[in-house]
Every structure is written in C-alpha cells, then in structure tokens.
C-alpha cells in the first residue's frame, strides 16, 4: 500500500527556500505570486493491506522521524 507524508514548516517559521523560490518566480515574471512555502513529500510503499493501519503507521513515522515537530507539521494520506 502506498502512503504519502507531506512535511511543511509551521506558520511563523522562517522559510528561506520558500523565499528564494518566490523571488525567482517574481524574477521570471510571475508577479501575482504571494508567499511561497517549501516542504517535503515522502512516498512510502508499505507491506500492509488495511488502509487504517497504513495511515496509522505513516502517522507514527511522521511523528517519530520524518518531521521535526518543533518547527514542522505533517499530514499522512493513503494513496492506494
């Protein structure tokens, strides 16, 4: 079963990559772009058939390793 964990910096935490991407987009002529936040997407293939258990495992992975909960938040979703 495939799961996706998306990790983002919490609101209020400085995001230098997001600022750089936003600046580059403005330089390329995309003047209508506002704030940009950059994050990470981790897709995992789990040997699991129960979607609820796969989601629970992805949540635990996010809490224990994939996200720094002091400055980041995460979401986990089952894809298939």
Regions found by a protein language model. Give the residues of each.
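Short, intrinsically disordered low-complexity segments
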Residues: 37-56
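Short amphipathic alpha-helix segments
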Residues: 12-28
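Short glycine-/aliphatic-rich beta-strand segments at the starts of folded cytosolic domains
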Residues: 1-11, 40-44
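Conserved functional loop/turn residues at catalytic and ligand-binding sites
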Residues: 29, 45, 69
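C-terminal structural segments of small proteins and small subunits
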Residues: 52-80
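Solvent-exposed beta-strand sheet faces enriched in polar/charged residues
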Residues: 6, 36, 45, 77-79
